[in-house]
């Protein structure tokens, strides 16, 4: 039996090895002209990996499936069951390497509908929590955050217009706006204020998100 040196390296404490971080986003979803279709997955992975590096918690990778409200039609998504089953796979294998607590960093609003099913995976010796970052779709905050992460094409911002790409702010997603008041309010805000790149705010938002998740990990130790 190998004696592992759990105290080695830049970590908060040896107990942090019992915490696993999972990224959750969406891989196949339109985000206008300036952001890639896997924006949510890349932002979630970027934050999760950086939190892992800072704290010493284990980065377990990203969930491949994602889900969405049935009336939001801007991408290709999976069932709640598909997402939960993939999380189960990561949790089961994470427990084999000594992980007892799991933090899911979710950066896709549609995935919040898994929360009730996710709670059922908790047990007395396995704790799972999901904390979500939900920004107005492909709009100012997400564009600026995408810039900070390094996935935004500034050249394509000139064409990043909700009148052309209806998924921006969900301005053109009529059914979603009719069925979800929060979506409609966000869409109206985008219609009134437009979409622009704020580089300073993007970097600040990214740092704040990373620091927030670092604190969550600290509280899980």
Swiss-Prot record:
SUPFAM superfamilies cross-referenced by the UniProt entry: Creatininase
Disulfide bond positions: none
A Pfam short name: Creatininase
MF annotations from Gene Ontology: 2-amino-5-formylamino-6-(5-phosphoribosylamino)pyrimidin-4(3H)-one formate-lyase activity; ferrous iron binding
Cofactor info, note text: Requires one Fe(2+) ion for activity. Requires an additional second metal ion that could be Fe(2+) or Zn(2+).
InterPro entries, per database record: Creatininase-like_sf, Creatininase/forma_Hydrolase, FAPy_deformylase
EC category name: hydrolase
Record pathway: Cofactor biosynthesis; coenzyme F420 biosynthesis; Cofactor biosynthesis; riboflavin biosynthesis
Keywords: Hydrolase, Iron, Metal-binding, Zinc
Catalytic activity: 2-amino-5-formylamino-6-(5-phospho-D-ribosylamino)pyrimidin-4(3H)-one + H2O = 2,5-diamino-6-(1-D-ribosylamino)pyrimidin-4(3H)-one 5'-phosphate + formate + H(+)
GO biological process per UniProt: F420-0 metabolic process; riboflavin biosynthetic process
Residues involved in Fe cation 2 binding: 31, 40
Sites where the protein binds Fe cation 1: 29, 40, 108
Cofactors required: Fe(2+); Zn(2+)
EC number: 3.5.1.102
Record text on subunit structure and interactions: Homodimer.
Function per UniProt: Catalyzes the hydrolysis of the formamide of 2-amino-5-formylamino-6-ribosylamino-4(3H)-pyrimidinone 5'-monophosphate (FAPy) to form 2,5-diamino-6-ribosylamino-4(3H)-pyrimidinone 5'-phosphate (APy).
Family that this chain belongs to: Belongs to the creatininase superfamily. FAPy deformylase family.
Protein name: 2-amino-5-formylamino-6-ribosylaminopyrimidin-4(3H)-one 5'-monophosphate deformylase
Provenance organism: Methanococcus maripaludis (strain DSM 14266 / JCM 13030 / NBRC 101832 / S2 / LL)
């Amino acid at each position: 039996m190998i004696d592992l040196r759990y105290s080695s390296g830049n970590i908060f404490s040896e107990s942090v090895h019992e915490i696993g971080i999972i990224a959750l986003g969406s891989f196949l979803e339109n985000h206008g002209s300036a952001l890639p279709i896997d924006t949510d997955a890349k932002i979630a992975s970027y934050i999760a990996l950086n939190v892992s590096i800072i704290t010493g918690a284990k980065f377990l990778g990203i969930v491949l499936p994602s889900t969405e409200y049935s009336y939001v039609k801007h991408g290709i998504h999976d069932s709640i069951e598909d997402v939960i089953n993939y999380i189960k796979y990561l949790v089961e294998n994470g427990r084999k390497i000594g992980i007892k607590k799991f933090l899911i960093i979710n950066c896709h609003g549609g995935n919040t509908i898994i929360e009730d099913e996710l709670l059922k995976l908790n047990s007395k010796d396995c704790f799972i929590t999901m904390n979500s970052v939900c920004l107005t779709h492909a709009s100012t905050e997400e564009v600026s955050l995408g810039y900070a992460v390094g996935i935004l094409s500034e050249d394509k911002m000139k064409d990043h217009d909700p009148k052309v790409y209806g998924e921006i702010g969900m301005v053109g997603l009529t059914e979603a706006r009719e069925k979800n008041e929060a979506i409609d309010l966000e869409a109206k805000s985008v219609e009134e204020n437009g979409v622009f790149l704020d580089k300073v705010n993007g970097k600040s938002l990214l740092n704040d998100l990373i620091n927030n998740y670092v604190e969550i990990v600290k509280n899980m130790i």
